[in-house]
């Protein structure tokens, strides 16, 4: 477990000693970088996010040929993206998304159950309903497209 602020070189060094990356960050620059580390080092990435009354969780697993990566879903739009520190977040959403991330992480580490790879869980906190979206790799993804074309 890493519980301190890390710059990019420190993140790269730390990634050599982990089995799963759990992304609980609040900015896209860090999320994109964690995604690159995940892909380069073949480490599963458990991604969770919450803003206002909405949350989402998925697993990107570069060890699986049909797994998309974070960049397959999200473009790099620079500083245009909202953060929960700017837009606010309904506090219970953090516990629900974080708990789901913890469950996915434990499943990966224990090699039990079916991880959320290729599926995005979306939580609507106002109606308290979950929905699931199937995810596929983007053939034009700048991070992982080459790995999908050669398999």
Model-flagged regions — what are they?
Residues 2-11:
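Conserved SAM/SAH-binding loop
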């Amino acid at each position: 477990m890493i519980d301190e602020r890390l710059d990019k070189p420190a993140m790269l060094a730390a990634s050599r000693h982990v089995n799963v990356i759990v992304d609980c960050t609040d900015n896209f620059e860090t999320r994109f970088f964690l995604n690159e580390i995940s892909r380069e080092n073949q480490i599963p990435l458990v991604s969770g996010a919450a803003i206002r009354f909405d949350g989402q969780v998925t697993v990107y697993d570069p060890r699986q040929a049909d797994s998309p990566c974070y960049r397959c879903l999200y473009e790099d739009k620079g500083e245009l993206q909202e953060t929960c520190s700017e837009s606010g977040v309904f506090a219970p959403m953090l516990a629900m998304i974080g708990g789901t991330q913890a469950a996915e992480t434990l499943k990966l580490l224990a090699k039990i159950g079916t991880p959320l790879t290729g599926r995005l869980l979306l939580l609507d906190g106002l109606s308290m309903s979950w929905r699931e979206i199937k995810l596929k790799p983007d053939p034009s993804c700048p991070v992982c497209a080459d790995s999908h074309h050669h398999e």
